Amino acid sequence: MGRPRLTLLCGVILAASAFTTPALAIDSADPLANETTAVAPAPVTRTGPSWAAPQIASVVAAGLMGPDVASFRPDDTLTREELHDAIVALGRPHAAPTDPTRVVTMRELDAQLVAAAGLLPSARQIRLAAAAAGLEPTDMLGTETVARLLGLRTNHPVGQEDLERSPKQPASRAEAAYSLAKLRLLDPSRIEAVRQVVATFSVPTLGEWQRLVLSRALRFVGYPYVFAGTSEKPQTIWSSSAPGNQLAVPGGFDCSGLVWRVFKLQPYDGAPSLADVLKGRTTYAMSGEVKKAQRISPGLVQPADVLFFGTQGTQSKPSEIGHSGIYVGNGWFVHSSSGGVTLQPLQGWYADELAWARRPLAEAGLTA
């Protein structure tokens, strides 16, 4: 997959790493047929060009969406007919929707584009591997992971987290333009690289507590990166640019917020002490809570360990730690970075900059 691009991880800048498509797709025949779409968010009023202006210009020029940029309506919700027309214009076969005016959710948008890339079998492989390990995956686990490995999702800047959308919220035409523009420019070699790396995904035999922790963590794959976010539900975060310094945002997480949600905010039945292990909310604080002698070296990590990444790799100090995640096993972990919450192979930058881990289960006196 190569070295990742520069991206936002937990508030600091780090280096991040043809078949007929059904009218509906997660990774099975028609999983969204009875889905309840979340209420559309209130339009975000901002002056100036859309955040997706370059991608809007790209898809308009390519004939995928809209007759011209001036009439594009970026903040309007996307319909299934519009998505169908765009996929067909890309040259991908796609069945016409039976309910063309129905709004497309974010997770449906991601799934449809993963299918258009020919990677629905890969997405299914991820979900089935997680299910085989007893992790109770959501039906969007595979498609949301593959969409992010392809680079189809983005992160809105700090202070504009209200533009983010959770999986069941309606997709805007701007979000669709961004993803379609990325898909249109994907080199076949990138698609093949994603197919090959997904083929490596597997989960080792897990202990009961590892299974419970990872089941919870994987439930959030597909949620957006929200700076200071700690919940899958709508939340209010502090923002220097918002009225009263309070900004209403959708469900989503930053990197340490995901770890905080998985281990801290909802005690596990039979293990109330696990919620007491983490004391500090930030990655910096979490990484520094374990003495140097108690740090888990990269070669000894186990499922459900919390991973810490720093600019100096294993030589990093707590002050140099800027990212965190939760190890799943067999070279994969789950984290929230610029594309949102996803499964990620421990390769490239992530392998180079993995500093150490801590084992909350053991710290709470629990066996795996």
Residue ranges and their predicted role:
Residues 58, 89, 115, 119, ...:
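Glycine-rich, acidic and aromatic/proline-enriched surface loops and short helix-turn segments
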Residues 2-25:
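Secretory targeting and sorting signals
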Residues 195-257, 261-272, 318-320:
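N-terminal capping segments
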Residues 24-53, 61, 65-80, 84, ...:
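Feature responds to low-complexity, polar/acidic, surface-exposed segments characteristic
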Residues 83-86, 109-112, 176-182, 252-265, ...:
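Active-site-proximal alpha-helical segments within enzyme catalytic domains
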Residues 351-368:
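Low-complexity, Gly/Ser/Thr/Pro-rich intrinsically disordered linker/tail segments
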Residues 67-71, 98, 121-126, 224-233, ...:
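Surface-exposed patches in mature extracellular/periplasmic domains of secreted proteins
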Residues 203-214, 260, 268-347:
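...with weaker cross-activation on analogous glycine-rich loops/strands in unrelated enzymes
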